[in-house]
Amino acid sequence: MDQEYQRAVTRICVETALLLLQHGAESAVVVQMAQRLGVALGIESVECALTANAVLLTTLSKQHCITTVRKNVDKGINMQIVTDVQHIVVAVEHHLYDLSMAQKKLDKLKSLKYNRYLVVFMIGLSCASFAHLSGGDMTICAITFIASAIAMFVRQEISKRHYNPLIVFAITAFVASLISGMSLKYSLGNDPHIALASSVLLLVPGFPLINSLADILKGYVNMGIGRWTIATVLTFGACLGIVFALNLLNIVSWVG
């Protein structure tokens, strides 16, 4: 195996790891996919180290090592990309793709974009469903739907302008709490506290928290702590938005 081929394999392995990490895969999956791809392409050994903002990968072939580093920029959770990358790796393992074909497939990957208004509607519907499950009447469900849908629209607009995620979460929580808080201020529905609590459920960073726990349990402690820290900061931003909205409405407590 010549060094040029090894360099090409190193590049595709680190690109694979980077794509998975950027789109929300847990650390064990990222490392395993990079290693499996390298071995399938004829590399003796692939070592991969992850940090919150970088991927470090080394390939070994005939006692010759090549190491490369790529900066990690979070692109949001997207399981479609993660699944497509895994399919490419499996295809290489089954000798359906060679190096050049696998590289072309990776280069052509594009994120699946849902219609933004469909996302707004579904977010509103899901939060309203939680309100219904919590015992809210139709008035509470309607208020929750409106508050969460408008908050999601605002979140999309702010995110398009690439604001800091902490600011995005704070403003989104502020908008949702301000609208749903009207039900508590003017005693609308059977239990206004349900609307206030359900309308901000779109901001719960459940996936990062689950991934952080999975990383820690599987030995990737630094990645687990990093992801847990990010999720905690985002939750803090949401709390700030809720507190500001409640203060503006002069609501002392939202506990029923």
Question: What is the predicted function of each stretch?
Answer:
Residues K113-N190:
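Core alpha-helical transmembrane segments of integral membrane proteins
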Residues K105, A149-H162, I210-N222:
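C-terminal ends of transmembrane helices
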Residues K185-G256:
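Generic detector of multi-pass transmembrane helix bundles and their immediately adjacent loops
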Residues V73-S126, A131-I140, I230-C239, N250:
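Alpha-helical transmembrane segments and their cytosolic membrane-interface
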